[in-house]
């Protein structure tokens, strides 16, 4: 049991980290992408360096919107040099859209761990922006309720959001997280599964699914979910080692 408790503790941070993960989500883009005036990404690298020093500076996002489209950032993320790829991942986090998800998911497998870390943050930011501006605002309020442990209020509000926006995957994920914290593991499993149906790239929901099965002592199902997690986001700290531990636990009851 001690080993299993440590296993759960290790991965709790990933799913809980979905509340306010990374920087505050940028607003949904409501304009046509502008042609880029910086094909090599030189301005992008400058903005990235400034972002590292001042991550909350609003003008950086505005500059990204002015000079780049999500499609151009995706190309730079795929073929740029090291610093350009890091910068492009940050840029997608700030202005990326639904079509950016595959590019960011690929970047989670980048040989540079900093690119992977930036892509992970960008994933959470893009997922929140997949709702309308109103839906994003409502979800941020739910996240705040979860943060202060007003869990019943969080469930009530996010359930209303799901009724009006049933295709908004991150709303399902946030309700799953809330159910998990309320120890309603079956309900959390159902919502994690729905999140993955809507967004098969959602490594947070895959990890949450594994944690729920662990709490219910359903070790084979937990292993399957963690194996999915590592396929989606292989650089999560200690994931491979913990999969090996869980495999051993299944073989030796």
Q: Model-flagged regions — what are they?
A:
Residues 22-98, 102, 106-148:
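Extended repeat-based scaffolds of very large eukaryotic assembly and lipid-transport proteins
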Residues 94, 125-129, 147, 181, ...:
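Register position in tetratricopeptide repeats
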